Amino acid sequence: MQRLINIVSGGCLILGIVIFIVAAASVGFYVHDERTVDAGNKRAASMVYKTVSVHDLTATKSEILPEDEMDIAAMRSVNPDTVGYLKVQGKEFPVVKAVDNKYLKTGWDGKKTCYGCIFMDGYCDLDGKNIVLYGHHMKNGKMFGTLGKYMTKAYRDENPTFKWITEEYVDTYTVIAAIRTKASDVSDILDMDLKSDIEKLSEKAKETGTLYGDFHTGKSYMSLITCEYTKKNGRLVVIGERTERLERKGK
């Protein structure tokens, strides 16, 4: 009996060690992935922002020039799939486009990462009525992990807009809705030219009290989509209406 107890105890100890090693490896992989995607995004930011030296009496500083001077072309020279640059919730992302799901597990710089990259729906056009962008809902708040805050009106009122920069324009979008829906219903969002689609979206937003403005046929929109975990195969969709377009001076 004592021998059996010793065997069981030893087995439990070994199992515990194995579990610890696997858990530690998983954490290490996750941290490595976080650093990888951060490095890729920082590299993109260093390219998109042209900087000049500014000298004052105390120090030499680096001054970030206005958004109309952003060098999107420099980013495209590194990754030809680059279509623009998104600024939302105090975060900034290079955005790519591909017809497959390549960027679900690939960063902007081409390195494999569970964070992926913010990417445009392969069937969208830059001049379309609704530009759809996808991003992972990371538990640490990275990528589109904080979009759920737009389900609260107070947060939306404090953070009403986000910006989209391409080689041609600097666009400002005003958030008019945040919607929880099923993955199978996302197709309703892709085409906002139809009055029936717009009515469906309005009703979905009204149900959760997160309709912050009116949808209009003929207007231009951007939809930010991520996973939503309060329902099976859920999706969170934050929709902005384009309220300002500036032609880039530095293009």
PLM regions and their residue ranges:
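Solvent-exposed, non-transmembrane regions of membrane-associated and secreted proteins
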Residues: F20-K251
